[in-house]
Amino acid sequence: MTFKHRYLAGACLAALALSCGGEAGAQAVSSTASAQTTLQEVVVTARRRSEDLQSVPISITAFTPKQLTDRHITNQVDLANNTPSLIAIQSGYPGEYGGFIVRGQGPAYNATSGTETYFAETPDPYLGLEGRPGSYYDLANLEVLKGPQGTLFGKNSTGGNVLFEPQRPTNSYGGYLEGQLGNYNDRQADGAVNLPIVDDKVLLRVAGTVERRDGYTTDVGPYFPGRDYDNLSYEGFRIGLLLKPVEGLESYTLYRYQQSDTNGAGTVPYANESTSPARIAAFDAQAARGVRDVSYDTLEFNKSFYSQVLNQTSYRFNDALTVKNIVSFTRDYLAYSYDYDASPINVAGQSSYAMPTQGFDYISEELQLQGKIQSLQYTAGLFGDNLYTPEYEGFNYITAPGHTVLLDQMTNDRSHAGFVQGTYDFGGLSPVLSGLSATAGYRETAEYTSSLSAVPIVHKVTAGSAAFQYGSYTFDIDYKLTPNTMIYASLRDAYKAGGFNTTVAASSGLSFYPPEKLVNKELGIKSTNELWGMQTRVDIAAYFGDYDNIQRQALVNVDNGMGGTVPVQVVQSVAKGRVDGVEFEGSLIPISGLVITVNYAYTDAAYTQVSPNAIGITLATPFPGLPQNKGSINTAYTFPINSEYGRVTLSGDVTYQSKVSVATTNQTPYPWLPAYGLLNLRLDWDHIFGRPIGAALFATNVTNKTYATGQLDFSASSGFVTRTYAPPRMFGLQLRYAFGPPH
């Protein structure tokens, strides 16, 4: 065992010695206006059934609706800042979208993501749909599962899952209205109403959100003076209907819709490799302006609409057997225009006015059986999905400035899977084995992908298809040392789908790439106890991942049919590696009314073997999407005032992320996004004078830190690098009114 492995394993042993615990993101705190003394149980659905977070042998960060509001989590970066081992990378286009990366497992260019997102147990068919602004209203909870999830969910994931669960209709009338006013002319409103149409038989819930906010990046001209980028303009709603016609039968149908119409992301030139005097002058002018003022030659915009209808129908035959079916249909269209080089020079841009730039239709179906046979709880099921993606992209390219060409690509991805997983409680065999449980699961997956691409700039039409079949497994064993302390060990195996590159010839040896595989070993402890009279909760996980057929994108030159070459992106699977780390989440109530939550992640990753055919990868190439250190501290103090005046809480959090590589190869001299730290503050007054009214003042990025959240690197092909930056200091006022029976 290496020194680092001893260090990681030792973290779990140290926690065992402490025999106390906490869980940072997932804590809900029960309190009165004058005291906060206990940490409340948190219910999660990580194993497709409701369980106490502390009894699940998986590293999980969970958020209640109040925590999402208190920490002002409104986009992917906000969520990542509050979750260890999760980061969000934004490319700049489409402006509101971004990818989640858990434990270094994320998306590669034109390939499947290693981290999957779900809404109401249905997969997100497109990278970045869930988590964008407008996703966080009227949720029941939000969970981030870390580590391979290969045997219980519809899609196979090597990094983890992000689960969005909406509020379902209940059998009581009620709801809420919430409004927000802030700087940059921010205006936001959320609301929901719950209507029991027929008592405990027909239940309806309607929720909606809308926001308008000016952008914080301004165009100085000469083409579009005064146009603001990074603005927000979206609206959405959900309609949920729950039917319970007979005992044991439930049918939940949800329709949701969201549309957005913005001016796009305000990307900023970061580096220039061109020797063109005009481009050098444009870059120098941008450097003098700073990152909040830009000059584009392409009229940017970002328009999208998204709709989904899903149904969950279950029938409980008895306490030991339930059958459940989940079906969904999703449609999404995007139209966007984007200035790749972010300058007033005609270098490279992309635009589509007459047709969607991207779009898809997606269908998923899952049949599930849940049951219990004495001491064995099991879940078995079948899953299938179909994703059809017609994509049209008009753009000006560096090798043909001033000429608009159309890239037309159609893809079809299908998968079918069968899975089974069971948990056995050995305490049923003998009292001596009480507290000992084991979980085993297996999933067999068959995937098929096909694509047709027309790329006029290289004068060719290419098509191809590929099929894959593989199995994934899970084995966990956990033991309760005490009723409040559990230790566990797990071994999990998962795959990420392979595919092919339509931009290169079959004879190149780069047209096909196999599935990516990760085998993960994990040790953990979860404990909720008292330490010197203080309520504590600690969750620690140490993991060791063996990574095979690592998918990385690289730049290659192909014949353009005009006597020259053109650079294109391809995905290659040419390396092995390891990803090891420790995750800590803890909560502490040192005095009545004061809650301190801490989370931290340390990650160490490296390539262990690289194929001689690898492009731009060596053993020394840094892993992308993996900051070595990442953490946050949140402190909330509820003032000891009489409850008839309400509850007043002052809270603040500090978050930190070390530098992170966003380059998948060493083909660029600009691989790193710098480290950053943030401070956020909030003052809440809930139940004002005993009324169902609340108010809050908030400020995010209090120190006005300028930090990058994404990068597009065309230095090798076109001589420029651009970056996307997070919002500056934001502040505002929130008001909330709840109606219906008191809770």
Summary of predicted features, one role per range:
Residues 1-83, 194, 247, 680, ...:
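N-terminal Sec signal peptide and the immediately downstream disordered periplasmic leader
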Residues 2, 368-370, 374-381, 422, ...:
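Conserved C-terminal beta-signal and adjacent last beta-strands/turns
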Residues 29, 45, 77, 81-122, ...:
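Extracytoplasmic beta-strand/coil segments of soluble accessory domains associated
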Residues 113-114, 124-128, 137-146, 151-237, ...:
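Outer-membrane beta-barrel translocator/receptor signature
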Residues 232-378, 386, 536:
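Outer-membrane beta-barrel domain signature, strongest for Gram-negative TonB-dependent receptors
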Residues 261-272, 386-396, 450-453, 479-522, ...:
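Surface-exposed extracellular loop regions of Gram-negative outer-membrane beta-barrel proteins
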Residues 308-340, 488-491, 496, 514-580, ...:
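Membrane-embedded beta-barrel scaffold of Gram-negative outer-membrane proteins
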Residues 375-379, 428, 438, 539, ...:
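Gram-negative outer-membrane beta-barrel transporters
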